[in-house]
Amino acid sequence: MATIHVDGKEYDVNGADNLLQACLSLGLDIPYFCWHPALGSVGACRQCAVKQYQNADDTRGRLVMSCMTPATDGTFISIDDSEAKAFRESVVEWLMTNHPHDCPVCEEGGNCHLQDMTVMTGHSFRRYRFTKRTHQNQDLGPFISHEMNRCIACYRCVRYYKDYADGTDLGVYGAHDNVYFGRTESGTLESEFSGNLVEVCPTGVFTDKTHSERYNRKWDMQFAPSICQQCSVGCNTSPGERYGELRRIENRYNGSVNHYFMCDRGRFGYGYVNLKDRPRQPQQLRGSDWIHLNADQVMQGAADILRQAKKTIGIGSPRASLESNFALRELVGAENFYTGIAAGEQQRLQLMLKVLREGGIYTPALREIESYDAVLILGEDLTQTGARIALSVRQAVKGKAREMAAAQKVADWQIAAIMNIGQHAKHPLFITNVDNTRMDDIAAWNYRAPVDDQARLGFAIAHALDESAPAVADLDRSLKGKVDIIVQALAGAKKPLIITGSSAGSDAIIEAAANVAKALKNRGSDVGITFVASAANSIGLSMIGGGSLDQALELLTRGEADSAIVMENDLYRHAAKDKVDAALDNVANLIVVDHQRTAIMDKANLILSAASFAESDGTLVNQEGRAQRFFQVYDPTYYDDPKKPESRSIMLESWRWLHSLHSTYTSRHVDWTQLDHVIAACVEALPQLQGIVEAAPDATFRIRGQRLARSPHRYSGRTAMRADISVHEPRQPQDIDTPFSFSMEGNNSPLADRQQIPFAWAPGWNSPQAWNKFQAEVGGSLRFGDPGVRLIEAGEGTLDYFDSIPAAFTATAGNWQIAPYYHLFGSEEMSQRSDVIQQRMPTPYVMVNPADAAALGVNLGTLVEFNCAGQTLRLPVRLSDTLAPGQVGLPLGLPGIPPILVGARVEDLREAVQ
């Protein structure tokens, strides 16, 4: 700690910080532009000037840039000094000479750091009356709009995009006061993290193009604390709504998880919530017609189905909340509950849980990954399957430069000096995958091989680290030298990290990763292990347990159950089409609960219109084992026209539908009237989920008697927004499930004792930089702790080494193994329904080694077809020199190419008949 003196007052601060960060952490306001907590200091904008004095007796002092000045013990500064204030105002005036006065039409208005800083410095009158420099804007793709004329040349965008996210296609061009930030030519930004430019940019140069189409000011939207539903990482988000539509998603700060950044799929992939073809009312099939029902009618109809059924099973979903899966389990009974996950995938998830619980290996939070100094990734194309983890790994690799700088006593925030000292030095990163990955640019070595061979390499590394681990007898000689290099790097690291997951479709690769981690732990290393799962709640559903989807389908095919309830699950993604069809042909009554129209609904008798994440509350468990609550953003019924009952929205949380059905079926009163009741019942029945109670406060939580506001206090137009429906303003929706209010009424103070924050706003801070006001220390944890609770902690380490080493892959003529390829834009079930994501999705393809292509007599672009898992695929050929012969790569998860094809065999690959 250090003691500094600011305007005559004494403060204790972190001596490792610079003065800007220290003062902001104290709650003192110093304007700034180029500095960012995650990007460090470069002193480019000169906006954060303060007066520094030599000692208490010095009355003259000198101007210094607070972001470039260490907070050393005994520092005396003044923020309010008249010279410093005048200098800061003049800096804004310089910046404004070329900045257009277009706030009323700028999409950043009301969410703009430049506006905040201009007001903070007191600059309110423009003296510049001459020509402004102007630029041509670029088309940067479907996600981001570009308006270069608003640029103040703070350099944040390129520092984030190039230096932090390792993007290569955004740069700065020009000189002196005429610089241009963009691409060499128009084109889609290639980085999977480009959307963060929207929040990193302090002005309106980069804005959310998906928001532009249905634009609202920040103060006119309703927000809620939420969790990204698009992968297993569990990034915290702030979705914003107006007029019953999601308008945008912003990053929500969580110091333990995603902190300031998220991936583009999570930010822009929300369009499926706004689709017009969503089921918005319950429907029942009568003859060949679908009849719309009200809630009471559909509950009676569903209860009659259950009463007449010989046996009913429930099929859950890894994209549904814990509460919804538990409600289905309670309805059908634990013995009749099936997870909706394919048997192989479920086995891999249970294996990962076993390692997490019994392996004795620590699983780091997402933010902690950045502190590791050697990383081995086995079988995951991490940028496509867990993108935000990939961004953290990039920071871990860059940690080498920080380590070198620290040895020379350079402060951690002196980023320009750190980069100069580091000269692109990196901590070692080793990657195995079936083909190239998006992280190859920072890897020390890449091993491209079939999945079984990747697992064998992992087992060999474990044995080289610890001879008591099982050996790989016939390892390829060419790999032994590489194994030695990897072993040397991992063993020499202070904190090695092993990353793997379920997407490779292999138990062996998970076991190999566990063996490597155990071998390192036996050597005394502070080792970590991170698993990547396939869906937002895969880990949570695995903790609930239940039969696999394969078992459920077998039961239905044999006729042992004649009715099924399928909740938020398109079975065709998790099982072969012919097996699903055969099973459902034997089902007398199929009840489907979902918020999206899926192929399974074509075979349903009854459809219950569920609420999406934006219209519901629930709990998810991420790949780390962290339980996190997401909250309802808006009530869709508020916008219903009472004169048009046929268009009324009847969308309830899946758990509400299922519990209501349970109560109707058993002729008893509804027990679960609010979310807290479900959670209490869940933890009583499933003690392993006990911690979810602490994931968020209950519905009775208040701050000084107030609920928490979902909307900023400047929210406007409430009395007019339904005027086209009725001039009579209805009562605002009442939230019985959470401590939030569906309005601006309530507490939104940055100083309030809460972790769940719907939106970032503080007096004088309207932009995302307002998160500074919610943090215990700027860039650290939130003031009252980061939300979420870990359900799994490393045990004593009772797990033995795994010894099921697979045989080496052998290519066989006329027989190919499907190798998994994943795409951030397209492989995930929900986001692929969004229009803007579809613009970034690749055309489906089959990847073939050139030698195999020559043997087949096909070329690049040739259409080939083959049968697999009960369906015929017809796809154009792509060629890859680095895909091992004997394999065909498929973009798993894209429409029509289910993920369960991973590892399957293809025997009849042939050129398609034109």
Curated annotation (Swiss-Prot):
InterPro entries with a match to the protein in the record: 2Fe-2S_ferredoxin-like_sf (IPR036010), 2Fe-2S_ferredoxin-type (IPR001041), Asp_de-COase-like_dom_sf (IPR009010), MoPterin_dinucl-bd_dom (IPR006657), Mopterin_OxRdtase (IPR006656), Mopterin_OxRdtase_4Fe-4S_dom (IPR006963), NADH_UbQ_OxRdtase_75kDa_su_CS (IPR000283), NADH_UbQ_OxRdtase_ferredoxin (IPR054351)
Free-text comment on the cofactor: Binds 1 [2Fe-2S] cluster per subunit. Binds 3 [4Fe-4S] clusters per subunit.
Positions contributing to [4Fe-4S] cluster 2 binding: C151, C154, C157, C201
Residues covered by the 4Fe-4S His(Cys)3-ligated-type domain: 83-122
Residues binding [4Fe-4S] cluster 1, per UniProt: H99, C103, C106, C112
Residues engaged in binding [2Fe-2S] cluster: C34, C45, C48, C67
Domain 4Fe-4S Mo/W bis-MGD-type stretches: 221-277
GO biological process, one term: respiratory electron transport chain
Residues annotated to bind [4Fe-4S] cluster 3: C228, C231, C235, C263
GO molecular function: 2 iron, 2 sulfur cluster binding; 4 iron, 4 sulfur cluster binding; metal ion binding; molybdopterin cofactor binding; NADH dehydrogenase (ubiquinone) activity; quinone binding
GO cellular component, one term: oxidoreductase complex
Domain 2Fe-2S ferredoxin-type: 1-83
Names of the cofactor(s): [2Fe-2S] cluster; [4Fe-4S] cluster
UniProt keyword terms in alphabetical order: 2Fe-2S, 4Fe-4S, Iron, Iron-sulfur, Metal-binding, NAD, Quinone, Translocase, Ubiquinone
EC number per UniProt: 7.1.1.-
Keyword NAD: yes
Family listed: Belongs to the complex I 75 kDa subunit family.
Protein name: NADH-quinone oxidoreductase subunit G
Biological source species: Yersinia pestis
